A protein has these predicted regions:
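Core SAM-dependent methyltransferase catalytic element
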Residues: 127-129, 133-154
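A short SAM/SAH-binding and catalytic strip from SAM-dependent methyltransferases
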Residues: 53-66
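A short glycine-rich, Lys/Arg-flanked "PGG" loop and its adjoining helix->strand segment in the class I
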Residues: 67-79
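A short acidic, Gly/Pro-enriched loop at the edge of an enzyme's catalytic core
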Residues: 42-54
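Conserved Rossmann-like nucleotide-binding pocket used by diverse enzymes
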Residues: 13, 37, 55-56, 84
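Short alpha-helix
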Residues: 112-128
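Class I SAM-dependent methyltransferase SAM/SAH-binding core
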Residues: 1-43
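Conserved class I S-adenosyl-L-methionine
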Residues: 84-107
Length: 154
């Protein structure tokens, strides 16, 4: 995804928990404004309010305690920043989607959260985010795209 955002940003930090995924992403030639690194989404090495946009793509459903990741994204995101959080909403799978989900589990991507689209958006809201835009992309495994802003904490 980071490669497709190059014209939209001055600096991009593309991270993944998997060294193999980062190695694959690094293939090719890219401008110096794109940095790749292996990171833990629960403990990011960036200063508070470092980013205008944080994108977590297809990951919240496969990690235990995704609410803890949202706390870390809140920390590194500027107050007026945007969280973009598309994720698969497996509770609405077709039979083919259930088979694909099983294959993902066998490949090492277990589902820790099986949300419907509505439940996923409610999860984001319950964890301090205002959902400004959402779209469900229907497929054998539906994907719910969400753009969020921080809810001001009192």
């Amino acid at each position: 995804m980071a490669k497709h955002l190059l014209c939209s940003a001055d600096h991009i930090e593309a991270t993944d928990a998997s060294a193999a995924m980062i190695a694959q992403a690094k293939r090719g030639n890219f401008p110096s404004k794109l940095y790749f690194s292996v990171q833990d989404m629960f403990h990011l090495p960036y200063a508070d309010q470092s980013f205008d946009v944080v994108i977590v793509c297809n990951a919240l459903h496969i990690v235990p305690h995704p609410e803890k990741a949202l706390i870390e994204f809140r920390r590194v995101l500027k107050n007026d920043g945007t969280l973009i959080a598309p994720t698969f909403t497996h509770a609405e799978n077709s039979p083919w989607g259930n088979l694909q989900a099983l294959a993902l589990k066998i490949a090492g991507f277990p589902l820790h959260s099986r949300w419907t689209s509505a439940a996923y958006l409610a999860f984001l809201q319950q964890n301090g985010w205002t959902v400004c835009k959402s779209v469900v992309l229907q497929n054998s495994i539906p994907l719910t795209y969400a753009e969020c802003k921080k809810v001001e904490r009192r």
